[in-house]
Amino acid sequence: MGDLLFFIAVSSLLMHEMDAIDKREWRLLFVLRKLPDEGALRWFIVLHLPLFVALLALVAAGPSATTRWIEGGVDVFLIVHAGLHESISARGDRAFATSFSRWLIWLAAAFAAIHLGYLVF
């Protein structure tokens, strides 16, 4: 059950990252927002490669004490990530204000929170 919760959370994050390309999320990132959109898009995509490789390696590694700690860290990140997006939206950036974008972000956070509870208890 715990693995399924984590897989849904991470899959929701991956879907959000696809949506983030459409929303030009690189404009929110300190270094990339200084680049022209075409270059920033390429960097945004390329910089996600090691993150996705790490997530897939984590999943492929199977259960262990170390992977559970890392999963917990990913869970915390997803919860904080949702809060950051809410904070950005509250400041007036409406890029992720669509109900679908918000749903993806909060779906990841919700399943991460449930999974984190599963890990802790």
Residue spans for each PLM region:
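Cytosolic, membrane-interface loops and tails of multi-pass inner-membrane proteins
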Residues: A20-E38, I88
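Juxtamembrane boundary at the C-terminal end of a transmembrane helix
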Residues: A113-F121
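Small-residue-rich segments of transmembrane alpha-helices in multi-pass membrane proteins
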Residues: G39, T98-A113
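Membrane-helix boundary connector in multi-pass membrane proteins
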Residues: S64-R68, G83-F100, V120-F121
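N-terminal signal-anchor/start-transfer transmembrane helix
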Residues: F7-R24
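A loop-to-helix transmembrane entry motif
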Residues: R33-L51, S101
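Short alpha-helical packing/oligomerization segments
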Residues: L49-H81
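Core segments of transmembrane alpha-helices
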Residues: W43-A57, W106-A112
